[in-house]
Amino acid sequence: NIVKNILKNKELNYNSITKKEQIFVRERSTSKILKLKLDYDKNNISEITPEMLQLVEKNSPKDNQSYSDILTNVYIKESELKFNPIKIVELKKEKNEELKNIGKTFKKLLENTKKDEYWRIKTGILGKKIPSTNNDSLGSDTSNTKSINIYKNTIKNYLGFATFKDKEQWEFLYKTNKYNFEIIGGTTMNSENVYVIDFSPKEKGLFQGRLYISIETFALIRADYKYAPNKLGKEMYMLGLGFSQTNFSGSIYFEKDMNKYNLKYFSFQNNNKFSLNRKIAWQKKKKRLLINKKLKEIKIGVDLVLAQKEVIELLVINQLKISDIEFNNFIEKKHVNVTYVNQFDKNLWKNHTIIEPTQEM
């Protein structure tokens, strides 16, 4: 009953005001190519040769790492979010010259497309039109500038973790019958008395962890949880596509202010595995009245297995209630500047409140 009361009292306990927050987000991602095999099937694009595919297979980095730090103000009104970055720092990616030249070849092909022509990527009956090279969704005007939507949508997605709306990530709150709960004691957090409750999965449950729940309000103040041993998340294998969630762990912490609870910090880690074993076609087509004409095509057999690990940390530095008018009056920029570095350094964030860089970074 104590755990069930978290969702019952959610609207009473957690702030849903129009507000401006300053937040710091750290993203760390690693990916490892476990298998990559490309088979040259058919081709009438003279600029792309079998040797190019061999170079892609040989030189594609087997281990990739990315790090980014984002300090930003966000304006929030119900489900709307506006993004006003203060500073964004990303790890500079090493570029393989041979892969870079191949990339230039593909870019040139896209640029040499007439108004009544377009490129399309296709696998089986599924296909998607490739945006033109001047489309904002491709990212940036220069190497140090990116579309704001790339970051805005990511931050909005991360903040969704703290709303408890994802019924799969917060399964133990929505499907309490799948879990065993045990009150192991009590403590105080920010002068508030709380239950300390451990939980573990029954046969169909997924997570194990510890909850800190207010005795007075039944608000979830802190949670630390992860996949229980021998448990996996989503798994999907269909038509040569595979995806499995192999690990998850998360922590979240709220602070009380004026009888409402506000997010202060969370972190979570996802481990996923992807596989692809399909033929993929890259086609150039000419628009016609009834059926578009295929001008060029390359078809490649792809056998790929990729493991990925993602670690996200988010710290709310401060929060200020604002009016709907102030929210509506703020106009976002279309692009943001990014600082690229070879390694992270404390001096990058001098005079700013952040999460300290790790030795690994």
Task: List where the protein language model places each region.
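Surface-exposed, low-complexity/disordered segments
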Residues: 1-166, 170-176, 190, 243-361
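Low-complexity, intrinsically disordered segments exposed to solvent
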Residues: 167, 178-185
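Feature captures eukaryotic membrane-trafficking machinery centered on endolysosomal pathways
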Residues: 182-234, 242-256
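A short, polar/proline- and glycine-enriched secondary-structure boundary/capping micro-motif
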Residues: 207, 232-237, 273-278
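Short, charged/polar low-complexity linear motifs in solvent-exposed/disordered segments
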Residues: 213-214, 238-240, 280-283
